[in-house]
Design a protein with these regions (language model features):
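Short acidic/polar hinge/loop motifs at secondary-structure boundaries
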Residues: 105, 130-157, 176-177
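Membrane-embedded beta-barrel scaffold of Gram-negative outer-membrane proteins
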Residues: 308-324, 328-334, 518-584, 591, ...
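Outer-membrane beta-barrel translocator/receptor signature
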Residues: 133-134, 149-151, 162-240, 248-252, ...
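Structural signature of Gram-negative outer-membrane beta-barrels, strongest in the C-terminal barrel
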Residues: 247, 360, 379-391, 428-546, ...
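Gram-negative outer-membrane beta-barrel transporters
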Residues: 447-448, 543, 567-649, 688, ...
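Acidic/polar loop-and-plug regions of large Gram-negative outer-membrane beta-barrel proteins
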Residues: 224-228, 241-312, 327-360, 403-426, ...
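N-terminal Sec signal peptide and the immediately downstream disordered periplasmic leader
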Residues: 1-88, 94-102, 667
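C-terminal beta-signal and adjacent terminal beta-strands/loops
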Residues: 640-649, 671-718
Length: 718
């Protein structure tokens, strides 16, 4: 793993040159534009970016694009601020999700997993309000992407079909990029070293690019590499951001940039570890056990070009034109192992190798008009919008005729020769085109009462190559309705309703795509804002009903390649509640704490998605010590989840439960502010070294979770 590829070196050099260009203006550019100067660490500005040094949420556009506060949105909203990302050292999206109220993660492989909320999978991943190229059946570790390029993360639980088309009732995750807002030279440099020889370095530089401060730039680069508690597994990651903003006039802002992310794991597991020995007794593997080989890899590259033009007509009306182009390439060579191990000889496992080349390109364009007007003596708000997206998806697979053997698995070290690969064959190719019109209004007829009414008309067409077939849905309407009532300055009650319509990428046993998920979602709740809005609380109760919900049903081989197939669950329902408190109790005390609980069943009253915990607690808090110890901040948290299970056939062909008991992970941190600009921070995760695992329902296999680990981070801001 002690390697740095030439490709990584070239990209890092290019970004270093760009960052040097920005910092070269530091001696002269001290002006401030009308869009504001960033605070002390110079990484935040504008209503969308989060307050420094706190867990206080700002305004959000993720649920309803009206620039509302969290309290004004009639849905459950969690915001992971930049300060919380730093306090917990949440470096990937999956780590963020594991620490969000009502959200769970099932890491079913070392480099893949699923994020879930309210009993259903989350597949609505958004960057700055624009959907990404994510495809669940062909996921390549996207949820393990770096958070270095993002200022904060918005998570809206429940359906967001009004703004993003996909009416998935689980959640939407919106990653908000760092912006080029600073008119003064600012920088943030971090160096981190952790368990299993993990090392990371990050640089974040921003400055004005002209004397007047009307043109600003920002560059972020992060490189990391390291090994793992899992044998053979190593990683190498590169994340880059170049962005700029220009004030074309007092009322017109042009912004744009490019991001590049590359993840290059070696030795990833494909599938998990067998649960049973061949005699039917349970296995108990050590935490470093792997089924991978030393030639396996899973390289993923994602490039995103983006541009926004915002014009403010007056104090009440504005328009925004946005465009983005995303391209994801994934190239893998993988080894899957099936069967069960003989307890005495170690024999019994069968290897299966396959390689994949995946390319996804997506263009998105949108036009949005926001306005406000006076009616009944109070301010009302309205938004009108059009969205267009076009995605091309191509996947090639390579099989092998090379004979392979695992031998005695107790002696397995991954030193199997790489097989000879056959020529690539087209596995799947399609194009998805969508366009939609949406509108919503925020009506305030009397002071304490507000209504949000809106809807979205969507056209969807998927053309599948090789089958000469297409799937088309025209003028599908998704309504949205919400009501908010302010009892006083502290407490607000709300209710919301939306329908669900979501085409699927999942296939049945015969290779046919499942029909769209359809249904509705209802939510009621109470929100509060204590300490002048510094501490926010939410109590939410919800009921969801869906038809055609995809459930993993088993494995099937198509064109020599193994795939998971799904069945559609009719009449699936989920109902539950969530409680969350997040923000600042005092300027020195940040806290987030949440409890969630749900029940999900199909029409036959059978539990669905049983691999998900029905009850969860997620907490974390930090406190800056007083007096002579004021340079020290300490913190910690607990993530607890109830037991989970899946039913699978054991070696005797009898259905048996694979059960994970309830468990809690304790995480601690401490930071010492050495000088005003220089700090050292220690994070320890899974303090009590709890053993736990994720499960792959279709395969009946498990992947062990991370044991106790630690990281030391040095940060210098100037």
């Amino acid at each position: 793993m002690q390697r740095t590829t030439k490709h990584f070196q070239i990209n890092a050099l290019a970004l270093a040159i760009a960052m040097s260009t920005i910092s070269a203006h530091a001696e002269t550019d001290q002006q401030t534009s009308e869009y504001g100067t960033l605070p002390t660490i110079k990484v935040k500005a504008g209503s969308g970016e989060e307050n420094e040094k706190s867990y206080i949420a700002g305004k959000t556009e993720t649920a309803v694009p009206l620039g509302l506060s969290v309290r004004e949105v009639p849905q459950s909203v969690s915001v992971i601020t930049q300060q919380r990302l730093q306090d917990q050292q949440l470096s990937t999206l999956v780590e963020v999700a594991e620490n969000v109220t009502g959200v769970s993660v099932n890491r079913y492989e070392t480099n893949r997993g699923g994020i879930y909320s309210r009993g259903f999978v989350v597949d609505n991943y958004i960057i700055d309000g624009i959907p990404t190229t994510y495809s669940l059946p062909w996921s390549s570790g996207e949820i393990f992407s770096s958070m270095a390029l993002y200022d904060h993360i918005d998570i809206v639980r429940g359906a967001t079909g009004l703004t993003f088309g996909a009416g998935n009732p689980s959640a939407a995750i919106n990653m908000v990029r760092k912006r080029a807002t600073s008119t003064e030279p600012t920088a943030n440099v971090e160096v981190s070293a952790g368990s299993w020889d993990n090392y990371r370095v990050m640089g974040d530089i921003a400055n004005s690019l002209n004397q007047s401060g009307t043109v600003r730039g920002r560059a972020v680069a992060q490189y990391e590499q390291g090994d793992s508690y899992t044998n053979l597994l190593s990683k190498e990651k590169l994340s880059l951001l170049l962005s700029a903003e220009a004030d074309l006039s007092e009322n017109t802002l042009l912004s744009g940039g490019v991001t590049y992310q590359e993840d290059d794991p070696r030795g990833p597991m494909w599938g998990g570890l067998p649960v049973w020995f061949s005699d039917g007794t349970k296995t108990n593997w050590s935490k470093n056990t792997t089924t991978s080989a030393d030639w396996t890899r899973w390289n993923v590259k994602y490039t995103n070009l983006f541009a926004d033009l915002t014009h403010k007509f007056n104090d009440s009306w504005s328009a925004k034109l946005s465009y983005s182009h995303g391209k994801r390439d994934a190239n893998s060579k993988l080894l899957y192992v099936s069967g069960s191990v003989d307890k005495n000889t170690g024999l019994g496992l069968s290897p299966y190798a396959s390689a994949y080349d995946l390319e996804v390109e997506q263009d998105n364009a949108s036009l949005q008009l926001n306005g406000s007007f006076d009616l009944w003596g109070l301010e009302q708000k309205v938004v009108l919008g059009y969205q267009y997206s076009n995605q091309d998806f191509t996947a090639y697979a390579r099989s092998t005729d090379t004979k392979m053997e695992i031998g005695n698995f107790f002696e397995w070290n991954g030193s199997m020769p790489e097989p000879v690969w056959n020529a690539p064959t087209l596995n799947e190719k399609y194009n998805i085109e969508q366009n939609a019109l949406f509108a919503a209004t925020y009506l305030n007829p009397i002071e304490p009462l507000k209504f949000i009414l809106g809807g979205r008309f969507t056209n969807y067409e998927k053309n599948i190559y090789g089958r000469n077939s297409s799937i088309k849905y025209d003028h599908e309407f998704v309504p949205y309705a919400g009501v908010i009532y302010d009892f006083n300055d502290v407490y607000t009650a709300y209710a919301s309703y939306t329908s669900i319509f979501q085409p699927q990428d999942n296939k049945d046993f015969d290779g046919n795509y499942l029909d769209p998920v359809e249904g509705n979602s209802t939510e009621v709740g109470l929100k509060s804002a204590w300490f002048d809005g510094r501490l926010n609380g939410t109590l939410a109760l919800y009921h969801i009903k869906q038809d055609n919900l995809a459930q993993e049903a088993g494995q099937v081989t198509r064109n020599g390649v193994k795939e998971i197939y799904y069945r559609a669950a009719k009449g699936a329902t989920s109902e539950g509640f969530e409680v969350e408190v997040s923000g600042q109790i005092t300027p020195d005390w940040n806290i987030t704490a949440g409890y969630s609980q749900f029940s999900a069943k199909d029409a036959n009253d059978a539990d669905v998605n049983t691999q998900l915990p029905r009850k969860m607690i997620q907490t974390f808090t930090t406190y800056k010590l007083p007096g002579k110890l004021e340079n020290i901040t300490v913190g910690g948290g607990v993530n607890w989840q109830s037991s989970t299970y899946v039913n699978a056939k054991n070696p005797k062909k009898v259905i048996e439960k694979i059960e994970q008991g309830d468990y809690a992970l304790v995480n601690l941190m401490a930071r010492y502010q050495i000088t005003k600009d220089f700090s050292a921070q220690l994070n320890i995760n899974n303090v009590f070294n709890k053993k736990y695992y994720g499960v792959f329902p279709a395969y009946g296999q498990i992947t062990l979770g991370a044991p106790r680990n630690a990281a030391l981070t040095l940060q210098y801001k100037f």
